[in-house]
């Protein structure tokens, strides 16, 4: 079985290579290809990924390429992890929003729309190549942000293969909870519902016993997990439901905007600076012949990115920070799966006798009765050899229903605007978004984002 990664020259490629290598046996992988349109990125990050993969599974063919046809030829599984436009476009997205006193976070609000304007056309070009060259039963896993919007656009474009939206923002919180509850992760059951980067967690049970009240009453929840950005009072106001970390930009909008404006640089500018310093250091070594030296440089700079996550936005230090590892330690450390783990769980399930719960973005059908059947939602699913069974949440409070419905309307309009390259629909989309909600602001933002030659065909 052949698996292809679109965007395989990204900074996080080593993690993906490690996860695929350790889990290749679960889905019978015989070939892995990392594709990227940047030969420079493949020469650095692709080579580190190659070394990691080959050290773990030297018996499986691993290659990197800039040729999309060769990469996708007869591919059975495809994972997309693209960043179209790179750091420069991200900075532009953020700065345009901030100039108009609104949040420009890369997957949320105005910034998320601007990113989708670039991501969706690029993904759809690859989708056409997948239909032409990949295996007839190929399965696509989309991790390209904004993942929910991109996944919905893929489905509504008429793409004929199975597609799932995957995200690793949810698994981190779920992995942190067993330490607070004194249980194993396999014994904890959680329901998640909503939209990508806009979801809530509810109905926590350990071996069938309800533990929600005990969990939300624990001070450690707000000190030692991704819930550190939220107050216990807010959790109570949300009907005792935990929050996806991206909801910080909604429930703490004013504080987040003030913090970002006062930080002196946006997250995109911070990442670009770290990446530039990393590239300069990596130019002093050859990643193919000096993998340990290249890995050490990469790890040092990667952790600067990882450990500073949400610092500017929340004015908080991240509780769980990572310590640097040597290349050998990285390879030998147990794999936690990440977004590759979700994809592997789905693929393995058809041949398994066990049931496992994951969170994935799929079409709603009748899972959330206040949304349309063709809407893409983010939802807990029970996996078994019978397939994916969405878990209808026990309770969706009215406030959450209204918020989800509002953002979903934005997503519908945004996807339609991008598929049709329609400026008026784009304005309607941003008008509907709760972080914007203004005709004059929406029109100004759309005109600013469209002021680029790549959007010349928009009307």
Language-model features: locations:
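Acidic, His- and aromatic-enriched active-site or binding-groove loops in soluble protein domains
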Residues: 160-177
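Glycine-rich phosphate-binding loop and adjoining beta1-alpha1-beta2 segment
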Residues: 25-57, 101
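Redox-cofactor binding/interface segments in oxidoreductases and associated redox assembly factors
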Residues: 73, 79-80, 142
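N-terminal Rossmann-like dinucleotide-binding module
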Residues: 3-32
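Short acidic low-complexity segments
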Residues: 61-74
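Long, compositionally biased stretches enriched for glycine and/or charged residues
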Residues: 182-459
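Gly/Ser/Thr-rich loops at beta-strand to alpha-helix junctions
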Residues: 9-13, 39-40, 142-150, 169-172
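Rossmann-fold NAD(P)-binding glycine/threonine-rich loop
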Residues: 84, 88-157
């Amino acid at each position: 079985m052949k698996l292809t990664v679109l965007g395989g020259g990204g900074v996080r490629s080593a993690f993906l290579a490690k996860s695929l290598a350790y889990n290749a046996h679960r889905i019978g992988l015989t070939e892995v290809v990392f594709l990227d349109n940047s030969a420079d990125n493949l020469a650095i990050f692709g080579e580190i990924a190659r070394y990691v993969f080959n050290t773990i599974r030297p018996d499986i063919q691993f290659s990197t390429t800039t040729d999309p046809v060769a990469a996708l030829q007869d591919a059975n599984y495809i994972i997309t992890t693209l960043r179209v436009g790179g750091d420069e476009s991200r900075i532009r997205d953020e700065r345009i929003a901030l100039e108009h006193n609104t949040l420009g976070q890369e997957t949320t609000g105005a910034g998320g729309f601007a990113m989708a304007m670039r991501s969706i056309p690029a993904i759809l070009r690859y989708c056409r190549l997948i239909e032409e060259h990949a295996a007839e039963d190929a399965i696509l896993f989309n991790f390209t942000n904004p993942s929910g919007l991109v996944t919905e656009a893929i489905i509504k474009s008429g793409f004929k293969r199975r597609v799932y939206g995957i995200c690793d923002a949810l698994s981190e919180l779920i992995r942190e909870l067993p330490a607070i509850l004194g249980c194993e992760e396999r014994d904890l059951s959680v329901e998640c519902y909503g939209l990508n980067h806009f979801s809530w967690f509810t109905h926590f049970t350990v071996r069938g016993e309800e533990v929600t009240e005990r969990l939300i009453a624990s001070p450690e929840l707000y000190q030692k997990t991704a819930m550190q950005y939220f107050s216990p009072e807010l959790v109570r106001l949300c009907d005792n439901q935990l929050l996806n970390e991206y909801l910080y930009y909604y429930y703490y909008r004013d504080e987040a905007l003030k913090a970002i404006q006062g930080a002196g640089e946006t997250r995109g500018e911070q990442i670009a600076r770290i990446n530039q310093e990393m590239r300069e250091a990596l130019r002093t070594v050859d990643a193919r012949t000096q993998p340990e030296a290249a890995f050490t440089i990469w790890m040092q700079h990667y952790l600067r990115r990882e450990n500073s996550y949400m610092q500017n936005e929340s004015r908080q230090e991240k509780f769980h920070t990572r310590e640097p590892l040597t290349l050998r330690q990285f390879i030998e450390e147990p794999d936690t799966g990440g977004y590759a783990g979700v994809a592997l769980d789905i693929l393995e399930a058809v041949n398994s006798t066990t049931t496992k719960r994951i969170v994935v973005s799929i079409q709603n059908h009748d899972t959330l009765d206040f949304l349309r059947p063709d809407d893409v939602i983010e939802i807990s699913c029970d996996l078994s050899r019978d397939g994916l069974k969405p878990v209808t949440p026990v309770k969706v409070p009215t406030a959450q229903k209204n918020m989800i419905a509002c953002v979903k309307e934005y997503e519908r309009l945004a996807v339609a605007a991008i598929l049709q390259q329609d400026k008026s629909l784009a304005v309607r989309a941003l008008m509907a978004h709760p972080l914007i909600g203004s005709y004059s602001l929406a029109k100004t933002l759309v005109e600013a984002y469209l002021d680029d030659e790549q959007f010349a065909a928009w009307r």
